[in-house]
A protein has these predicted regions:
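Conserved beta-loop-beta element that borders a ligand/cofactor-binding pocket
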Residues: 118-140
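Conserved Rossmann-fold NAD(P)-dependent oxidoreductase catalytic core, especially the SDR/UDP-sugar
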Residues: 60-113, 130
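Amphipathic terminal alpha-helices
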Residues: 4, 251-263
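Glycine-rich "substrate-gating" loop/helix at the edge of Rossmann-like oxidoreductase active sites
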Residues: 107, 135-144, 164-174
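Mid/C-terminal beta-alpha module of Rossmann-like enzyme folds, strongest
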Residues: 180-233
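Conserved C-terminal active-site "lid" loop/helix of NAD(P)H-dependent oxidoreductases
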Residues: 174, 208, 226-247, 252
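NAD(P)H-binding glycine-rich loop region in Rossmannoid oxidoreductase-like domains
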Residues: 13-69, 82
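Alpha-helical substrate-binding/gating segment
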Residues: 151-161, 166-195
Length: 263
């Protein structure tokens, strides 16, 4: 839409949703030889990596992109922070000098994989890297169905599980996440940036909102579920706001989203 020359790289398990408007390369992100071949003879102004989960993958990407790109936008996560009830700022996890293991004795957790990937980019990338730390992403087409889990269970009179209803979380809408990634590609920024809608919500308030929408009372038991966390887990977006991005208000879109899911 903006007139850019765009190439997407996927495993080819789904059709290219953009038809001939973008180039489509089929590859396995975890296969370094396929990845290297895809960049042969090509230089990209901006590369977006949404599926780097380990320090090894980050290291391989640096080895390839050091001669083939001028800028990388790496999709990281709020999971690099501990859920300890304190609002998280970017400096609460510093990837510089963080220890990473390229040949781990056991598979990295999602959070640890992202921490170590950020650390590798700090050490080995000779191009600017923006690490975008997203909270849980919400949307109508969320393949994880995390919000849908609560809506459907309450609608059907089935129990939902929590360990702390007063725990608060931050979220971002899928469309807003996409807008932020685009902005990050062209903004004069570098390093880690939290990207989250303004505001936070307790699990109690979230469930009450769903109850209002579906007109049913939730059955709540103690246990684990997608949003069941022991303590509040949310971020501040002040750094990105100061850099020029305008975030939405969580309260403006959460209830309308629940209404769409409940239909």
């Amino acid at each position: 839409q903006q007139g850019h020359d765009v190439t997407i790289a996927t495993r080819g398990q789904h059709d290219n949703p953009f038809d001939e408007r973008v180039h489509h390369t089929i590859l396995d992100r975890t296969n370094s030889s396929e990845l290297r071949k895809a960049f042969e003879g090509t230089v990209y102004d901006i590369v977006y990596d949404n599926i780097c989960y380990t320090p090894k993958e980050a290291m391989e990407l640096c080895a390839i992109l050091n001669d083939h790109t001028t800028r990388l936008i790496f999709t990281s996560t709020m999971s690099v922070y501990e859920a300890d009830g304190v609002a998280k700022r970017e400096e609460d996890f510093n990837a510089m000098n963080y220890i990473y293991d390229l040949i781990p004795s056991q598979q990295h957790s999602y959070a640890e994989g992202k921490r170590q990937a950020e650390a590798v980019f700090e050490d080995y990338a000779n191009f600017p890297v923006v690490a975008v730390r997203f909270p849980i992403v919400m949307g109508e087409d969320d393949y994880t169905s995390r919000l849908s889990y609560y809506v459907e269970h309450i609608e059907q009179g089935e129990a939902i599980e929590f360990v702390n209803l007063d725990a608060e979380m931050s979220f971002i809408l899928a469309d807003e996440a996409a807008e932020f990634l685009y902005w990050a590609g062209f903004a004069n920024i570098e390093g880690p940036y939290n990207a989250t809608a303004n505001g936070k919500i307790s699990m109690r308030k979230l469930i009450q909102t769903i109850e209002q929408v579906v007109d049913k009372e939730a059955i709540i038991v103690e246990g684990t579920s997608p949003y069941s966390i022991p303590a509040s887990w949310y971020m501040t977006n002040a750094k990105a706001t100061e850099a020029g991005f305008t975030f939405t208000q969580l309260t403006d879109w959460l209830k309308p989203l629940i209404e769409k899911i409940a239909k």
